[in-house]
Amino acid sequence: MINKMNKIKAIALASMLLSFTTFAQKAEVPKNWHQLDPASTGYNGVSLQKAYDLAKSKKLKSKRVLVAVIDSGIDTAHEDLKPILWVNKKEIPGNGIDDDKNGYIDDVNGWNFIGGKDGRNVKEDSYESARVYYKLKTKWEGKEPITLEEKAEYAEFKRAQKSVIGDDDGGGASTILFLKQAETNLKKADTLLQKVLGKETYTGKEAEAYETKTNEEKKAKGMFLGIMKNGGGLEQTNKEFIDGLIEYTASLEKKEDAKNNPPVAYRSNITGDDENNLNDRNYGNNDLLASTPMHGTHCAGIIAAVRNNKKGGDGMADNVSIMAIRAVPDGDEHDKDIANAIRYAVDNGAQIISMSFGKDFSPEKEWVDDAIRYAASKNVLLVHAAGNDAKNVDTTYNFPNPIFKNGRATNLITVGASGDKKNGGLTASFSNYGKNEVDVFAPGVNIFSTLPGGDKYGPLSGTSMACPVVAGIAALMLQYYPNLTAVQLKEVIEKSAVVSKEKVNNPETKEKVLLSDISKTGGFVNAYEALKYAAKISETKTPIVVPRTIIKKGKKG
């Protein structure tokens, strides 16, 4: 068993997992807490039913809205998602022909930009920091820049070098070694607990209720549950917890390997396109499930899982179609794939795009920026997760973002994650923040939604979950007020956010601050207030203008 010192380390490291893996649903928090009304229930939700009641009382007509989810893949066979999937009516399923001549064969429900024509799919990928570092290493290692252009590239090289190499004090290797030891000990304890509980899969709560009969059982139970409590909570299963630890260890190994070895060309070995040519767009396949659908399936369900069917949980919006676009691997996404995914969504009629991904390097940022501009020109709102590093994104990097070299996007909203007092606090401990660059906070802790692999459901946490909450509210607004522009829709979400007078935790410093100190609006999103604000905007006689360019100069490109 793990000795006392290692147990302390294990608990600390397990706590680190909270930023990367699942959060367990705590018993005292309802599964749908994020949708509840704060005034009547005491939970810091978005007053969703109150919004529906208002729409009903006003006899508002609902028009179907198309939301694209750019993510890791979606379980298109899930009982709560299959009925709401977008269907490309111009494409004949399974005939192997590009019927609509858009360059993508059999894109019936969407497209997979990280797949090959031979049916293979990109599952894992390297980190962008490593890709940038090794691309520029030969050019700049041991050299000094002269021109302004060279100095900018050199600065990016040094930033990537610091990210990849760091202090290189051996701490990463020792952490990995310890985690592998912890994994071995956890598996031993798990084997014993499986035996005494009489089942292969059990929750922490079930293990907690078991009365041990031997000292060995007592030690195994104490060690396993002690770490599990700090690594997600006792509602998760033994397999979910151990798998999360294994995945986290693997991510650290990938980062450690990058210190000495160039990244593997995971993507180009499968997709077959010219990665450096944005115009080479006709690549990928139509496999939307692929091998990494957990994240995307959960996000899609948050937005639009079939409501009121008494299965699992209800989505935010009840008249939405989901367009599935796979562009995010286990690792960092490529700018080309994100740019093409945005353009695909826009060209096929998406009105809102949910983007629960991000990275701290973007070597082809102009490709993504141009795609965001293109979306603006077609009146499409983009909703983006702020990230899970508990960092201030006013002073650090999180891409994509609305900051362009020559201005600022007006059709992109950035979302931080909120919680509940009964669930760890009003702000999520992992959420990125920023007085200038995070627009609003939305529920992102223990969000119950769809999971892949046979009509499953469960809780996950992250700004990745807060993002589709906002996308779902935006879709609900557009259902009832379809003439709203993307800019107006962004205004509705932001201006209707409920400003918090209560001090909250700064996710990074843990200081008590006002929400307005760590976000632009200082507010939590609220569907009911948003619907009221949308009504005001729709009743104005101000001409609708869709901005095609940027109106405010940004501070970093």
What is each PLM-predicted segment?
Residues 380, 401-479, 483, 487, ...:
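Extracellular S/T/G-rich loop segment that most often corresponds to the catalytic His/Ser-adjacent loop
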Residues 53-67, 74-274, 278-334, 408-411, ...:
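Subtilisin-like serine protease catalytic core
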Residues 52-61, 290-293, 314-317, 332-354, ...:
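Mature extracellular/periplasmic domains of secretome proteins
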Residues 326, 354-358, 385-386, 416-417, ...:
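A cross-family glycoside hydrolase active-site/sugar-binding cleft signature
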Residues 22-43, 380, 535-557:
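Sec-dependent signal peptide cleavage junction
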Residues 71, 387, 462:
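Active-site glycine-centered loops adjacent to acidic/histidine catalytic or metal-binding residues
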Residues 1-28:
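Bacterial Sec-dependent N-terminal signal peptides
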Residues 346-348, 352-355, 364-366, 411-414, ...:
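C-terminal subdomain of the subtilisin-like protease fold in secreted/lumenal serine endopeptidases
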